[in-house]
Swiss-Prot record:
Protein name: Beta-glucosidase 14
Keywords: Disulfide bond, Glycoprotein, Glycosidase, Hydrolase, Signal
Membrane-spanning residues: none
Catalytic reaction(s) noted: Hydrolysis of terminal, non-reducing beta-D-glucosyl residues with release of beta-D-glucose
Family matches, as InterPro entries: Glyco_hydro_1, Glyco_hydro_1_N_CS, Glycoside_hydrolase_SF
Length: 489
């Protein structure tokens, strides 16, 4: 498996150099026509981060409601998403902003507990939740904007967490399947692009190893503020159930809806691109292991029905679950496209394997450090060459800025970030990667999880002190000019 990583790395280096050699050292200006004619440009959000209306119209609580409201000290500014951007009431304005900028797609997530307040069919379906998403989808289509719907973006219903531990319990696989079934049945006549899970790696790492995100579980030696958890075992159980939940969801879509609705179902995976810290053989192996425990962790089962060999070799003591032959067959090929959420890349350095205070973070025996540019192109090519050239969308890409309390609309650093990353996406396409679209994160400044409202990712400034008023930032105008056919840096 490691030799395959090196082969892929060589392909990437040679292909990248071939493109770069043909270009000027400075970043060329961009046109929309530099991308394929059917290339999709969109922006993304998630339900808990923007919707608000946490206790309105029958919505049940999620683990993020509990985590942020019961333990406000775990959020940097003590805030929560109970109101957030109030998109539940202001969705028409937000769709208007998408249209004004020129985006032709919107990636949003559906709140599980807004559809199923208690998380499962026994608790009943909330028609008001169905109505809200119908209204949002219809508004998007009326403006010529394609809906990309994410079924799960971290907001597990609290009732399922209480009943059997949420994604720690095998029961959640069927409950998620039933929830996805409702979404397909209710919205699939108009939604043609579905994402089952957003960043399962983040759920596993931050919710069950670091303990800094809901449900806030970890080993005590990792974070004394965690009330319970085991960073050596729970992450792998949760990851296993997430993968199986994805598999069951796409299985039900293909069985019941694919023929009539003709949609596509994928998954959004996050990872940086890890290069060796030095040219030593040890660091090269560490870089391969770092990829195995991040991107490959969730991609490999969808291609081969198995976990990466480096994970099998490194996770000692029977802590890594195994797939049955039936589950393995279900998972193989269980995607129509792969979403890539990319922000930055790092270097991986070999470190001794730990025998004490073991967690998922120590299992790769690699220290990931520093940041570097250029990783989005390399990660795309890695996915292309290693995983059978999948159809890909960049489902998230963006950068934050500190919230100062002032209305700041000039975000030149964000423009530079988007220009450079879009150019690298274009380079990957020229090499032959099958990338079909790009979604900026995020349309709006919003509740940024454990950071609360202390950072801003939006193309649109939201004034949280004045009725959630929206203002286009300079980066939004940059996208508008780009999408209207004008050259931009």
């Amino acid at each position: 498996m490691t030799s395959k990583y090196f082969s892929v790395l060589v392909f990437i280096i040679l292909a990248s150099n071939e493109v770069v050699a043909k270009r000027h050292s400075s970043t060329p200006k961009l046109r929309k026509t530099d991308f394929p004619e059917d290339f999709i440009f969109g922006a993304a959000t998630s339900a808990y981060q923007v919707e608000g209306a946490a206790q309105e119209d029958g919505r049940g609580p999620s683990i993020w409601d509990t985590f942020s409201e019961k333990y406000p000290e775990k959020i940097k500014d003590g805030s929560n998403g109970s109101i957030a951007d109030d998109s539940y009431h202001l969705y028409k304005e937000d769709v208007g902003l998408l249209h004004q900028i020129g985006f032709n797609a919107y990636r949003f997530s559906i709140s599980w507990s807004r559809i199923l307040p208690r998380g499962n069919l026994k608790g009943g379906i909330n028609q008001a939740g169905i109505d809200y998403y119908n209204n949002l989808i219809n508004e998007l289509l009326s403006k010529g904007i394609k809906p990309f719907a994410t079924i799960f973006h971290w907001d597990t219903p609290q009732d399922l967490e209480d009943a059997y531990g949420g994604f720690r319990g095998a029961e959640i696989v069927n409950d998620f399947r039933d929830y996805a079934d409702i979404c397909f049945k209710s919205f699939g006549d108009r939604v043609k692009h579905w994402i089952t899970l957003n960043e399962p790696l983040t759920v596993v790492q931050q919710g069950y190893v670091a303990g800094v995100m809901a449900p806030g579980r970890c080993s005590k030696f990792t974070n004394p503020n965690c009330t319970a958890g085991n960073g050596a075992t729970e992450p792998y159980i949760v990851g296993h159930n997430l993968i199986l939940a994805h598999g069951e969801a796409i299985k039900v879509y293909r069985k019941k809806y694919k023929a009539s609705q003709k949609g596509q179902v994928g998954i959004a995976l996050n990872a940086g691109w890890n290069l060796p810290y030095t040219e030593s053989a040890e660091d090269r192996l560490a870089a391969a292991r770092a990829m195995a425990f991040t991107f490959d962790y969730f991609m490999e089962p969808l291609v081969t029905g198995k976990y990466p060999v480096d994970m099998v070799n490194n996770v000692k003591g029977g802590r890594l679950p195994t797939f049955t032959s039936k589950q393995s067959n279900m998972l193989k090929g269980s995607y129509d496209f792969i979403g890539i959420n990319y922000y930055s890349s790092s270097y991986a350095k070999d470190v001794p394997c730990s025998s004490e205070n073991v967690t998922m973070f120590s299992d790769p025996c690699a220290s990931v450090t520093g940041e570097r540019d250029g990783g989005i192109r390399d990660l795309i090519l890695y996915a292309k060459y290693k995983f059978k050239d999948p159809v890909m969308y960049i489902t998230e890409n963006g950068r934050d800025e500190a919230s100062t309390g002032k209305i700041l609309l000039k975000d030149g650093d964000r423009i530079d970030y988007y220009a450079r990353h879009l150019k690298m996406v274009q380079d990957a396409i020229l090499i032959g990667a099958n990338v079909k679209g790009f979604f900026a994160w995020s349309l709006l400044d919003n509740f940024e999880w454990a950071s609360g409202y202390t950072v801003r990712f939006g193309l649109v400034y939201v004034d949280f002190n004045d009725r959630r008023k929206r203002y286009l930032k300079k980066s939004a105008h940059w996208f508008r000019h780009l999408l209207n056919g004008k050259k931009e840096n």
